[in-house]
Amino acid sequence: MTYKIYFLFFIFLGCAQVTSLNLQKHQFGQIPTKIVWIQVAGFEEEHLATLKFDSSTKDEALSFEKFLCLGKAWEYNLYNIRPTAESSFLGQLTGDRNIKNSCEDYKAKPIWKLISKNGYKVGAFENGASNDESLESAKACGQDGSNFLDDLVIWKMNKAPAKSSQFFHVNEKSNFEKKTTYYDRSCLTGECYSNLSQNIKSVFSQFSRKSDKYLFIVRDFKYKSDLASKNYSKYKASLKELEKTVEYFLSLSSESKNMLVLLTSAKSKVLEFPKSGNQWKEFEQSGKYLIDRKSKLISTVMASGARAENFCGIYNQSQILPRIFSGSKQQGLELAIINPFD
């Protein structure tokens, strides 16, 4: 009888322990009902040195450093090694490695088609996406493309194609409708006067209002363009905007146990940072040592909040999607495998 008491004591003691991930308190097996997915073309975590070694912030932890989990995803599919950023992002959103850069790609089901039937609101915010990079490129693929974009609201920081387009603005309140694309009113001349973090805060607060289930996707292609320009000021400004965006969403996730903040990259670029203090000063002033090489074969994944534990490790890009929901859920003293898509 004594042995049974000790056995039960240790079981309940284990259940009462506070679990942690990356030395931070974390509840495992939590199903995300509020999902923010940030896709950044060109990003690689070493780029954060640009902000980390800034004289004004070097002793402070960056928002990026507060993610609970850092993972890596292989950048290839069935047809290409180092595919384009838009192809990689499509593979991530659909969980499909069979990406051909053709209309056939839009026959696959993206994440929003899997969860919208369960009451999730879905929206995608695009920054600096070209016609080929934008999700709207699916519209050129007939019914498959139209079906692919069903239930989706799209916001774009781009110049509107026509005066009759729908618009949003950082200082305006709107009721956003499904199957509609909204353009940033501040981009009418081609150059956007509102910044990324302010726009996202404004749009997201309206989009998520009175909603317990949502998927909000941020797709940033401007970062890749600014990096390729080798203009240090533009590149650093884009990175700072991402830092502010991450800070905003991580702050929200700390207040909601059902919220997942996921950041993934594609076409990740390696930068050759300077080796010494004097060179770093030149780098900051002129971007003299801002040299980029070929994109990497492996890209960055960062996660915090519900199901963050699933994103540690190395895996294929097509495996990012199922990791959002698949896994184990604690039920009493046993673990049961769940899948909300069944």
Q: Which residues make up each language-model segment?
A:
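Metal-dependent active-site segment of extracytoplasmic phospho-/sulfohydrolases and closely related
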Residues: 45-48, 241-279
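Active-site nucleophile/metal-coordination loop of metallo-enzymes that catalyze phosphate/sulfate
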Residues: 21-34, 44-145, 303, 312-314
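Membrane-interface soluble catalytic domains
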Residues: 19-27, 253, 275-277, 282-342
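A long, amphipathic alpha-helix that forms part
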Residues: 21-24, 28, 194-216, 223-259
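Sec-dependent signal peptide recognition
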Residues: 2-9
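Loop/turn elements at helix/coil->beta-strand transitions in domains of secreted/extracellular proteins
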Residues: 31-36, 117-123, 209-216, 254-261, ...
